[in-house]
């Protein structure tokens, strides 16, 4: 049995890494709308390939049919429908999503925090979800506050906000994983002392262990 608590750090999460533009003045609205219509005419009937990491329920996970599913997948497919385009979603490692945009994939939608470093590489849409980081520990753990994480081994998914936070904790060792579920499995098996992850996936994992 696991338990979790929220951290004081919050980040704008789940921002799809496909560029979006907003008219800066009211006078530009008509021009912007015309440009959008023209772009839609050029893309209609095409295919958009988006990458995700289907290890982040309820936002993205592998469905019963073996294909990526979840809130983000439904969202990007709705965008594709609005544009008159087919959307294909590829499941890949989270840490490779940003570097794959522009070659292997057209964009990414994967519960991704907007950071200055990432903004130097890709464009982000407006943020549509604000997430709080949770710390998951065994029910009998002595860890009850943020200070208790000092000098502990903390599991986290590679390239995520949880990893960035774990790396900043005094004396702590950030044990990274390609899949969040692997971090939770190691927590259950006593290989790490805690896991830092977004609130919603933490709540899902808590129901499974």
Indicate residue ranges for each PLM-predicted region.
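Short Pro/Gly-enriched coil loops immediately N-terminal to beta-strands
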Residues: 122-134
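Ligand-binding cleft/hinge of the Venus flytrap
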Residues: 60-64, 76-85, 161-179, 206-209
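Alpha-to-beta junction loops
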Residues: 84-86, 102-110, 153, 188-201
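Bacterial lipoprotein signal-peptidase II cleavage site
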Residues: 4-24
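Flexible hinge/capping segments at coil-to-helix
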Residues: 137-154
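Extracytoplasmic small-molecule ligand-binding "clamshell" domains
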Residues: 41-112
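A ligand-binding cleft/hinge motif common to bilobed small-molecule-binding domains
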Residues: 95-99, 112-121, 165-168, 193-209
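Short helix-initiation/N-cap motifs at beta->coil->alpha
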Residues: 73, 89-100, 141, 158, ...
């Amino acid at each position: 049995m696991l338990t979790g608590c929220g951290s004081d750090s919050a980040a704008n999460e789940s921002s799809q890494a496909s560029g979006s533009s907003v008219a800066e003045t009211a006078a530009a609205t008509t021009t912007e709308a015309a440009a959008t219509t023209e772009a839609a005419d050029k893309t209609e009937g095409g295919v958009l390939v988006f990458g995700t990491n289907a290890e982040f329920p309820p936002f993205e996970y592998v469905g019963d049919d073996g294909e990526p599913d979840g809130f983000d997948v439904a969202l990007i497919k709705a965008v594709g429908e609005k544009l008159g385009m087919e959307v294909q979603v590829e499941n890949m490692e989270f840490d490779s999503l940003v570097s794959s945009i522009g070659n292997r994939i057209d964009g990414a939608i994967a519960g991704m925090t907007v950071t200055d470093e990432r903004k130097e590489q890709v464009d982000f849409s407006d943020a549509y979800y604000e997430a709080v980081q949770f710390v998951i520990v065994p029910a009998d753990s002595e860890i009850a506050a943020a200070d208790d994480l000092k000098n502990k081994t903390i599991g986290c998914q590679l390239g995520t906000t949880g990893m960035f936070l774990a790396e900043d904790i005094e004396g702590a060792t950030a044990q990274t994983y390609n899949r969040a579920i692997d971090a939770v499995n190691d927590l259950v098996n006593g290989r790490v002392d805690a896991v830092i992850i977004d609130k919603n996936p933490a709540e899902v994992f808590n129901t499974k262990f």
